[in-house]
Amino acid sequence: MSGSQLWAAVVVLLLLQSAQGVYIKYHGFQVQLESVKKLSELEEKQMSSPQLRKSGLLLPDVCHNPALPLDLQPICASQEAASTFKALRTIATDECELCINVACTGC
């Protein structure tokens, strides 16, 4: 394999890896890290904007938001939606849970 072919193979592998994204699996749900970041943004907006808040006794307020990412919407059907969203936000901010940091044990 020549140097240019090797270089092309490395570039293709890097592109494939970045296209896959980072997924979080929790209690049977698989969501993208970017979706969890969007969830946090939506919740922050709802907290700062009282007119966006709806009174949802059974569902977290964010479940009523049409901007909620598609991969998070099935969680709203769960009785554990609020605790699942909380756990996903916690996981998304923990580098060892996501195995971003190679120094983390168990990664």
Swiss-Prot record:
Gene3D superfamilies: Guanylin (3.90.1450.10). Disulfide bonds join 63-76, 96-104, 99-107. Pfam families: Guanylin (PF02058). Endogenous activator of intestinal guanylate cyclase. It stimulates this enzyme through the same receptor binding region as the heat-stable enterotoxins. May be a potent physiological regulator of intestinal fluid and electrolyte transport. May be an autocrine/paracrine regulator of intestinal salt and water transport. One of its GO terms (cellular component) is extracellular region. It comes from the Eukaryota. InterPro entries: Guanylin, Guanylin_sf. Keywords: Disulfide bond, Secreted, Signal. The keyword Amino-acid biosynthesis does not apply. It is found in: Secreted. This is Guanylate cyclase activator 2B. Its main location: secreted. Belongs to the guanylin family. Residues 22-92 form a propeptide. Residues 1-21 form the signal peptide. The gene is GUCA2B. It comes from Notomys alexis (Spinifex hopping mouse). One of its GO terms (molecular function) is guanylate cyclase activator activity.
